[in-house]
Structure formats: structure tokens, C-alpha cells
Amino acid sequence: DAAADTLTIRFIDNGCGIDAETVQKVINPFFTTRTTRKVGLGLPLLKQNTEQTGGSLDIQSEKGKGTTVTAVFGLTHLDRPPMGDLAGTVVLTASAYPDIRFIFHYQNDKVDYVFDTKEVNEALDGISIQEPEVIEYLKEMIESNISEE
């Protein structure tokens, strides 16, 4: 939202959700539910990055219903990390988990684009989203649709 000088990233899942007590714990870098390693840095680093730009991190979750993580950054703040390769990240994630439906919604003052793996898989008509040619095509498709040029 350029008018508000904010960049908002929202992750929504309809998974198992977490209880209120755990929501408070997940922003601690030394808390994790994983058994492979004892540190969970994803959300703590996201929180740190939002706050260093004057933004915030909000986590809403309900056990059995899912979780919504909203990260708000200062859009023009000098310390806001660059967006990076959004298209590549979306396609890599979608192709790594082909049985999960991913919806990527990119919106700003000039662009409003939705990438939905349900629609993609229907269009592919049995061709795997994991095929290298499909991955490259989808990456180019997303890049062209979110380009502001």
C-alpha cells in the first residue's frame, strides 16, 4: 500500500492451527516443535525484519482451523530487505509440494495477480507441476504478471 507506505505479506493456511500459548512461543528463536534441530528462526527473523522497518508481525491461529501470519514492513524504509525472487520462490514451493494447493496473490497500486495451483493443475491436465519445463514456464508467467513495467 504505497499510500500508507507499507508492504504487507500474509501467509494463510488451513492446517491444524496452534493454541494461544504456542502462538506466543513461536517468536522465540529457541522454541521449535521440530525434533531435528532445537532452533526455529523463521518467525523470529521475520518479526525482527518487520520491526526494524517500523512494521509489525501478527500471528492469529485457532486449533483445528489454521493460522494467519501477517508481516507489515515499511515500504520505503531503508532497512526493508529486497523482495528477492518471488516467482522462483512460489514455483519452487508449489512444485516441491504438488499435493498442496498454493494461492499466491500479488497486489499493489498497478498489479493485481493471483496464481492458484488448483487452476494450474487443471490446465496441465495430468502433466506434473514438477516437470522442469513446467517450472520454468510458470516462473516466467508469474514474473510477467507481477512486473510493473
Regions found by a protein language model. Name each.
Residues 1-9:
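Short beta-strand-loop-beta element adjacent to the nucleotide/active-site pocket used for signaling
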Residues 7, 49-52:
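Polybasic/polar functional segments that serve as interface/processing modules
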Residues 13:
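Acidic ATP/Mg2+-coordinating residue in the GHKL
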Residues 16-17:
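Glycine-rich G1-box
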Residues 20-29:
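Short conserved segment of the HATPase_c
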Residues 33:
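ATP-binding "lid"/motif region of the histidine kinase catalytic
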Residues 37-48, 82-86:
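Glycine-rich phosphate-binding loop
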Residues 52-149:
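Flexible, glycine-/charge-rich segments associated with ATP-binding catalytic modules
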